[in-house]
Amino acid sequence: MFSWLGNDDRRKKDPEVFQTVSDGLKKLYKTKLLPLEEYYRFHEFHSPALEDADFDNKPMVLLVGQYSTGKTTFIRYLLEQDFPGMRIGPEPTTDSFIAVMQGDVEGIIPGNALVVDPKKPFRKLNAFGNAFLNRFVCAQLPNAVLESISVIDTPGILSGEKQRISRGYDFAAVLEWFAERVDRIILLFDAHKLDISDEFSEVIKALKNHEDKMRVVLNKADQIETQQLMRVYGALMWSLGKIVNTPEVIRVYIGSFWSHPLLIPDNRKLFEAEEQDLFRDIQSLPRNAALRKLNDLIKRARLAKVHAYIISSLKKEMPSVFGKDTKKKELVNNLAEIYGRIEREHQISPGDFPNLKRMQDQLQAQDFSKFQPLKSKLLEVVDDMLAHDIAQLMVLVRQEETQRPVQMVKGGAFEGTLQGPFGHGYGEGAGEGIDDAEWVVARDKPMYDEIFYTLSPVDGKITGANAKKEMVRSKLPNSVLGKIWKLADIDKDGMLDDEEFALANHLIKVKLEGHELPSELPAHLLPPSKRKVSE
């Protein structure tokens, strides 16, 4: 009789089936989250509605910093070529937002044309008006790096009130719009003249909901000596600790990101290691792009739910006829109490609420009579999406990761550090002697042989027990020594001959010098007598 009730129930329990993560995100947003956003005017308070291009676009990297910290030079270093509209100098040069993207031919697309292109994820930027669009361009060029990622260059942040007023648009709001949609935010600081102006502090605070995307680069570190670099690094961490309100330590990369010779090469190895870490982080973006979009949708859904509770609470408190203006002022002033009540009634985390001061400012300009009462059905749909459909998409994300080839950023500066003698760590640690004709272990073998013959070899081999007595003198943990034993015991007979023993000691030396052990023994470390056997 009431079969339609059962059908509705079943529909609720069974999550939707999607072909790809991107299609799933689009469908969930349009059918389940967007109706809630529109009903409670979410877009007027927080963020414009998402479009298909927001789900389809490549990973984006946003560069933010004060003027002359090396933002544009950093992009030039990554791409290993100039891009249209690029200007570099010690004075404030970049006066526009430049989206550096892949294109078949080099050229510049002006802002007004860019925001009407449905294939680009910038259509909603038209809300910032002509003052901004005249300062926004897209630089297109064919480049291998840009096949995997896009980079957003921003105007340098200046000190003083004039730069804030004379821009003609809300600079912090534009940055926040980009921060919501990019995969990585890189804050650049100049090690040679470390300074965090009030404007820069405000910008960092505006990005506070996106700390998980933030990385810090202390650039131009080759201009100062080691002792000064330590002081500058300490000062930077102290300053950031006051601005970024997070208990976790933000990751700071130290280096000199340009293609000129290092001015002070004392810390060359440090810079190389830091550059590799940063490059690995950027290279992982295409692989994690779907997960990032999923994470951002969840974050947006949680904010939309809280916003719905706030708006419906304000509607409920408003009188129907008299004293509306007085009540409106009272409600805005007591918004903190409303936050507290919603938090208790609906068990919502305080971190999910929008900024109190900003919300109060926005509410002053709103007509409360146009607000809508609580509509439980809309909220239930979003709750159902978070509980069931998102879990389904998480499974799909993992499936796509395993089925597709590993996606990495290639070309430009990423290419020069992967292989060959200038690859990171080439010829060091277990890689030492990779290009030598002679077996690298042979250099120290006479010393190892002296120890070997004191360990009572039988038929030219020592037992595992005797080898252990000598190997534990290194004070390395048993787990590490066990791995060294597996690598050195090439014929797997549970004993070591003189060459295998020398190899084990060589690997111990590699580990004690701070290098990682290989998972498999490299060909150049194979003892000469064992090479024919392995072949």
From Swiss-Prot:
Outline the subunit composition: Homooligomer. Heterooligomer with EHD1. Heterooligomer with EHD2 and EHD4; ATP-binding is required for heterooligomerization. Interacts with PACSIN1. Interacts with PACSIN2. Interacts (via EH domain) with MICALL1. Interacts (via EH domain) with RAB11FIP2. Interacts with ANK2. Interacts with CACNA1GG and CACNA1H.
Q: Which organism is it from?
A: Mus musculus (Mouse)
One GO CC annotation, please? Answer: recycling endosome membrane
Report residues of the Glycyl lysine isopeptide (Lys-Gly) (interchain with G-Cter in SUMO) crosslink. K315, K511
InterPro entries per the record?
DUF5600, Dynamin_N, EF-hand-dom_pair, EF_Hand_1_Ca_BS, EF_hand_dom, EH_dom, EHD_N, G_DYNAMIN_dom
Sequence segments annotated as region (G5 motif): 243
Instruction: Note down the stretches annotated as region G4 motif.
Output: 219-222
User: Which GO terms fall under biological process for this protein?
Assistant: cilium assembly; early endosome to Golgi transport; endocytic recycling; Golgi to lysosome transport; positive regulation of voltage-gated calcium channel activity; protein homooligomerization; protein localization to plasma membrane; protein transport
Q: Where are the transmembrane segments?
A: none
What protein name is recorded for this chain?
A: EH domain-containing protein 3
Every Dynamin-type G domain range: 55-286
Q: Membrane topology for this entry?
A: Peripheral membrane protein
The residues the record assigns to binding Ca(2+) are: D489, D491, D493, M495, E500
Keyword Coiled coil listed: yes
Q: Name one Pfam family in it.
A: DUF5600
